[in-house]
Amino acid sequence: MKSLHCVGLYLLSLLCQLTEAKKHCWYFEGLYPTYYICRAYEDCCGSRCCVRALSIQRLWYFWFLLMMGVLFCCGAGFFIRRRMYPPLLVDEPTFNVSYTRQPAGPPGGPQQPVMPYYSDPGGAMGNPMTPSFYVQPNSPQGNPPFPPPPSYCNTPPPPYEQVVKSYK
C-alpha cells in the first residue's frame, strides 16, 4: 500500500513537471551551444542563469516613464503657479501721475498731516521711482473732501465761431 502511494505521488509530480510551461534556453560555450531550462516566469540571462521576467530593475521603460511623469508634473505645477501668482513687477513707470488733487486747506490755518499710501511693500520712500498716492487720514474712506469744481465747468462751452473769431 505504501509503495502504491509513493508511485502515485511520483507520477503526479511527473505530470506536474510536464504540464508546467518551461523555457528552453541556450548559450555558446566556446564553439558549441549549451542548453538549459528556465521556468515560465523567468527569462534566460546568458550563462545558465534565469532571472525573474518582471523584476523592476529590468523595466527601464517603467523608470523612464516614471521620471518623465515627475518632470511633467513639476513643469505643469510651475507653469500653473506662475499663471496664478505672477511675480511682482519691480520696474515701475518712470512718470509720476497724480491721481487725486490735494484739497485746499484753510488759507491761514495749519495744514493737516498727510499719510502716504504705499503702492508696494518697499514703500515710496524705499523706491524713488514709485509714485505715492495721498489720502486724508480723517476723511471717510470713499469720499475725500475736494474743493468745488471751477465755475467754467457749470457753463456750456462757447460756440465754435466765437472761439475762431477770438483767435483772429
Swiss-Prot record:
> Which regions span the lipid bilayer?
60-80
Give the signal sequence positions. Answer: 1-21
Keyword Transmembrane included in the entry's annotation: yes
Q: Where is this chain compositionally biased, Pro residues type?
A: 142-160
Q: Which family does it belong to?
A: Belongs to the VOPP1/ECOP family.
Please give the function described in this protein's UniProt entry: May be involved in the transcriptional activity of NFKB1. May regulate WWOX role as tumor suppressor.
Could you tell me what this protein is called? WW domain binding protein VOPP1
